[in-house]
Amino acid sequence: MDIIIIIIDDYYFDLTIYANMHPGGRKILKKFHLKDATDKFNQVKGHGDSFVIGELDKYCVGQVKNIDIEKYIQENYRI
C-alpha cells in the first residue's frame, strides 16, 4: 500500500486508507503525496461543503509547522 499524505491549508492529511474511497481515485491523491494540494482542492466543486470538510478533518495528523512528517511516517508505517 502506498502512503498518501497531502497538505491542505498548511495541515497534513493522511489519506492512505481513504484513498481507495476517493471519488477521483487513488492516483490523483498519490500525485500530491507530501505536496501542497490546497489550490487543486479548492478548485474542485463541492470540496468546500461542510460534509467534505468534516470528513477531511478525520484524517488530519497535524499542522505542517508543528509535525515532523518523516517521523510520523516511520512511527505509523513499516517502511
What are these regions (language model features)?
Residues M1-I79:
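Histidine-anchored, small-residue-rich loop motif
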